[in-house]
Amino acid sequence: AVAAGTVMLFADYYSYTEVNGVVVILGFLWNRLWGVYSDPNYGAVFSAITIIMSLYFYKDAKKPLKALYIINIVLQICYIAFSDSRTGMVSLFCALLVYVYLTALRSKKLEAKKAFARGVICVLLAVTAAVASFAAIKVVSVSTSEFKKWQYEHIISSDKDKTDAQKEKDKQKLEIGRQSNDINGDVSNRRFAIWGSGLEIFKTKPLTGVTFRNYVPYAEDKLPDTYLVNNDFIEFHSMHNSFVDILVSQGILGVVIIAAYIILVLVLIFKNFFKFKGEKYKYNTALLSIIAPIFASMMFYSETFYMNTGGAFLFWLALGYLIQSVTSKNSEAKEITPGK
């Protein structure tokens, strides 16, 4: 998908169609690389997860495979840059914080350090890695924009087969990413308004909610002026935040149930997480680092709960494996071989 999307970027290919009332976008449109994903945010979060998996397998891989893992990491960073997904960048930041911190914590080079000093060093390494990923994304974005400007000045602008209107349209594609006027000064890209509308709906039925698939019919009937169904864009069928989704869909009862579940799972994981060493610890770290970016993405779009998406599948799969792994006794745990 990343390779296909990259070809679409440099070929300026895009497709904009409507299927059963749902807009389907492919390629490079509105200065963002959608690729073959229904939403570039999905692709960017998958890229963050793929980077973590490449790092996990890299250390124990043979040299030819190491080169492929490096190339893969570069491609995934490129996709996040071209997609201009802030959700993807936040997810990658969280994934690297978790992975680098936990990996460094058990590094043999830091074993001699005192606990406090080791902790500080691990935090610094994790933050450095996360910030470096942001810098890499920015470099890719800026350098690609400069290349496209060169391409326009030396090739497209002198193309006699293109009309002035076509050339002007090509000129608008020179920048990678949304510009400030694209989101009309709204840094949340409508999310704040959607969340506010969700709270309006929640107040009408706070205890049990209105159910997830009933947002639009309920709002049209009870709150026809709320932003969810009355705006200058489209009707929104989700809250673009998984926890606001729960609040509106299942009310206070749903929030209490989910909060209790999250707390119990976290206690179960971290009560046992640091009991393991070696490959089992690395394996658990990789699983937790897959869960972290998906959990972070839940703050910015509807994911995991009520959804049948690739991200939901990965989240529950990784969480299931992690819980099984950390709750198994050392004597019961199967030997995990290093990734090749």
Regions found by a protein language model. Give the residues of each.
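A membrane-periplasm/extracellular boundary helix in multi-pass inner-membrane enzymes
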Residues: 103-182, 196-204, 212
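Long extracytoplasmic/lumenal interhelical loops at the membrane interface
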Residues: 21-22, 180-204, 208-250
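Alpha-helical transmembrane segments of multi-pass inner-membrane proteins
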Residues: 1-21, 36-109, 292, 297
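Transmembrane alpha-helices of multi-pass inner-membrane enzymes
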Residues: 92, 96-99, 261, 286-340
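Hydrophobic transmembrane alpha-helices and their immediate junctions
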Residues: 97, 101-106, 113, 223-228, ...
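Membrane-interface micro-motifs in multi-pass membrane enzymes
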Residues: 34-47, 87, 239-242, 247-251, ...
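Membrane-interface junctions at the ends of membrane-embedded or membrane-associated helices
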Residues: 58-67, 102-115, 272-277, 322-340
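Transmembrane alpha-helices of multi-pass, membrane-embedded glycan-processing enzymes
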Residues: 1, 8, 47, 69, ...
